[in-house]
């Protein structure tokens, strides 16, 4: 302690010295608390990061649902080409949402429900409208397709780890969308394809979980190629790409697409 401070304190009454010491300690404590307490900006940034982590996958599911609803509107207004492309975009979003949820440790009951609602909208209702026409039998086929997707989503839990029972509806939808584009909306071809897809979806066959973004590198390359095809490629080559991708899952489910590989 300096000589000046010592002389100053020596001239003060003992009570004043105690008050001064307590006041200084109080100021120091307040400064420490200010340093240790996070600012409102820090709290807001932390909350934003946590909100983003928990809802990134949900945002993808909602985007898938938006694609489905937009596809429905396009079909009702006669824009079949746009409707098919929106279904294919939904296909990519659906493959991504589960992977993002697991990667960020953000799986939840809400996310599972959103995923099912989005799948039913895009791969059930929107895809069925690709079959819609003024013919009564086509309308019945539309309803049968929607019901098969509903049954597939609600009742076909296999109980076997890493396995689905019945063809996942995203693949049947991708095939129908590609066939519609490649055939120019030929109803005879679409009817035959839809009936085959319905049978695959309600069958008792087992298909592996298709965790494309959580498996081998070549599967991630396939997914990246799908994104490039949708954004940059002309429709014939993109349709052939998605058609081969989806058909390979039906023909070689375990040998090619098992998430354990």
Regions found by a protein language model. Give the residues of each.
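Helix-coil boundary and interhelical linker segments in multi-pass alpha-helical membrane proteins
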Residues: 70-85, 121-143, 178-192, 234-240
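Membrane-embedded alpha-helical segments that form the functional core of polytopic membrane enzymes
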Residues: 54-113, 127, 140-146
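Lipid-exposed faces of alpha-helical membrane segments in multi-pass integral membrane proteins
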Residues: 56, 60-66, 86-89, 121-124, ...
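Short, amphipathic, aromatic/basic-enriched membrane-interface segments that mark the entry/exit
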Residues: 50-59, 108-115, 159-166, 209-218
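C-terminal ends of transmembrane helices
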Residues: 97-107, 148-163, 202-210, 253-261
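Hydrophobic positions within alpha-helical membrane elements
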Residues: 69, 99-102, 120, 124, ...
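C-terminal membrane-associated helical module and adjoining short loops/tails
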Residues: 1-45, 164-261
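Internal catalytic or translocation cores that form aromatic/hydrophobic pockets or channels
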Residues: 103-165
């Amino acid at each position: 302690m300096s000589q000046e401070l010592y002389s100053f304190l020596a001239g003060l009454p003992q009570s004043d010295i105690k008050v001064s010491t307590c006041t200084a300690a109080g100021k120091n404590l307040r400064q420490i608390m200010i340093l240790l307490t996070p600012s409102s900006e820090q709290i807001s940034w932390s909350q934003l990061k946590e909100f983003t982590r928990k809802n990134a996958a949900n945002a993808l599911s909602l985007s898938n649902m938006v694609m489905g609803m937009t596809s429905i509107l396009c079909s009702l207004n006669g824009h079949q080409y746009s409707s098919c492309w929106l279904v294919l975009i939904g296909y990519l979003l659906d493959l991504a949402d589960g992977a993002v949820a697991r990667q960020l440790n953000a799986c939840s009951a809400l996310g599972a429900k959103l995923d099912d609602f989005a799948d039913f909208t895009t791969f059930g209702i929107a895809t069925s409208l690709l079959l819609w026409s003024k013919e009564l039998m086509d309308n019945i086929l539309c309803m049968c397709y929607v019901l098969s997707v509903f049954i597939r989503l609600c009742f076909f839990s296999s109980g076997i780890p890493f396995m689905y029972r019945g063809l996942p509806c995203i693949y049947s939808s991708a095939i129908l969308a590609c066939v519609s584009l490649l055939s120019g909306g030929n109803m005879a071809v679409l009817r035959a394809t839809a009936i085959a897809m319905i049978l695959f979806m309600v069958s008792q066959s087992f298909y592996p979980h298709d965790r494309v973004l959580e498996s081998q590198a070549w599967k991630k390359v396939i997914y990246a190629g799908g994104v490039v095809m949708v954004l940059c490629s002309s429709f014939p080559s993109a349709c052939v790409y998605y058609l081969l991708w989806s058909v390979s899952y039906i023909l070689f489910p375990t040998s090619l697409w098992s998430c354990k590989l």
